[in-house]
């Protein structure tokens, strides 16, 4: 049996930073060559400990920042109901659609926070005038619902 430190989550074995004992062949032929683990040494253990402590600090800071932005978005009237102008026909259908990039641009300028378009979740394409609800996923644990009102230019 060989001790290794996991540097990736491995199903059925453990998560990042765990010290596990595996058979020598599994370590030598699979885990280490694929970059999923490193051989256990005292130096490697200390290094992984430092990395995981820094990762936990970064994750805590990112979570707190996401919560602050979510509180700001929830409090501001401008971002609770975001208004977007779009070209539309007489029947209320848009020429094209409102995309996550459009929403992110307007939301960023309205709130003063940089919101990436990848954080905007639209359930179905917005192709009509009216009110639509979108989710802003600021962090895996922090989501904010925003009402988007699309009106004709």
From Swiss-Prot:
Coiled coil: none annotated. Gene3D superfamilies: Ribosomal protein L9, C-terminal domain, Ribosomal protein L9, N-terminal domain. Binds to the 23S rRNA. Keywords: Ribonucleoprotein, Ribosomal protein, RNA-binding, rRNA-binding. It comes from Tropheryma whipplei (strain Twist) (Whipple's bacillus). This is Large ribosomal subunit protein bL9. The gene is rplI. GO terms for molecular function: rRNA binding; structural constituent of ribosome. The keyword Translocase does not apply. It comes from the Bacteria. Pfam families: Ribosomal_L9_C (PF03948), Ribosomal_L9_N (PF01281).
